UniProtKB/Swiss-Prot annotation:
This protein's name: Centrosomal protein 15
Job of this protein: May play a role in ciliary assembly.
Annotated localization: Cell projection, Cilium
Coiled coil regions, renumbered to chain: none
A cellular component term, taken from the record's GO annotations: cilium
A Pfam family hit: CEP15-like
Record keywords: Cell projection
Length: 127
């Protein structure tokens, strides 16, 4: 009977040790999850702060670029605007000829001076 009693005492002590270890582990887990949540919240706040900063920087860069462009070319000269308009009109006029040539449906659109290059260019266009 004494051995059962000592065994019961031993098991009771072991049970108390296990419970204290369990309590200690639960406390560590709580601390760890608390630290992770704190770290996660801190990281989220840092991310939001960085996003706001990056957005401000992008706006500043856009504003600086716009200011630079206006200083670089304040107003194009009328002669330059006229030249640009005539250039684009010429391009639009010649697009159909070149389009057919590049699709391989028409001969080289400009005079005969470059006729020796035509077969190469046309074969390239057909590929």
């Amino acid at each position: 009977m004494a051995s059962l009693f000592t065994q019961e005492i031993h098991l009771s002590k072991r049970h108390e040790e296990i419970l204290s270890q369990r309590l200690m582990l639960l406390q560590k887990m709580k601390n760890k999850f608390g630290d992770e949540n704190t770290e996660r919240a801190s990281l989220l706040q840092a991310t939001e702060t960085a996003s706001r900063r990056n957005l401000r920087l992008l706006k500043d860069i856009d504003a600086a670029e716009e200011a630079f462009q206006t200083k670089l070319i304040p107003h194009p000269q009328p002669s330059m605007l006229s030249l640009e308009t005539r250039y684009w009109a010429s391009v639009e006029e010649h697009i159909p000829k070149w389009e057919l040539f590049l699709l391989g449906r028409a001969p080289y659109p400009i005079g005969a001076e470059n006729q020796n290059e035509v077969p190469f260019v046309q074969t390239e266009a057909k590929l």
